[in-house]
């Protein structure tokens, strides 16, 4: 039996962490099979070690392609250790970021090119794609303003040093992904109050996978 792989994407400040913190317990109350929440970069011991290297603010000399390769390496290990075993058991895996993040941040933001980053990650994942991706959409400046307003509540990382232009390129790359993958990616208006965003995510998942729910 093959499980169900769902990913969450969005620009910085979209509120994925807050949404998932509320959404996951709601899903767990209604689904028929075990549900696993994980994240990228990270999600497994080796992957978390790579995450620390990627996000360390001291690593300002990191080359864009080095960064992209590290994300892909972290993803591969996470896939082998966590995602694939859970899916093989028929479970649900919900992942905070996956390949789309690399395409947007390194392909778009770092200007490596979406196609090059996608090919790199297709090798890392052996072509595994989510069955559904929920994209939490907020205007770039709104997301950055949210980050600033919560700067005392979150750990500062290397991506926080990036310019507005970088984040605009990331957003543009995400918009292209949505257009190119209309069956897989569903855009959710994340400027709405948290309860409405969570409700929209819950409804999208239940409509797409009614067989998973009691």
UniProtKB/Swiss-Prot annotation:
Q: Which residues bind ATP?
A: 10-17
Q: Which GO terms describe its molecular function?
A: ATP binding; dTMP kinase activity
**GO BP term (any one):** dTDP biosynthetic process
Q: What is its EC number?
A: 2.7.4.9
Please name the Gene3D superfamilies in this protein's record.
P-loop containing nucleotide triphosphate hydrolases
**Presence of the UniProt keyword Metal-binding in the record:** no
GO cellular component terms given for this protein:
cytosol
In terms of PROSITE patterns, this protein maps to: THYMIDYLATE_KINASE
Disulfide bonds, paired cysteine numbers: none
Tell me its family.
Belongs to the thymidylate kinase family.
Q: Which HAMAP family did the record assign?
A: Thymidylate_kinase (MF_00165)
Job of this protein: Phosphorylation of dTMP to form dTDP in both de novo and salvage pathways of dTTP synthesis.
Q: Which NCBIfam families match?
A: DTMP_kinase
Q: Could you identify this protein by its name? A: Thymidylate kinase
This protein's encoding gene: tmk
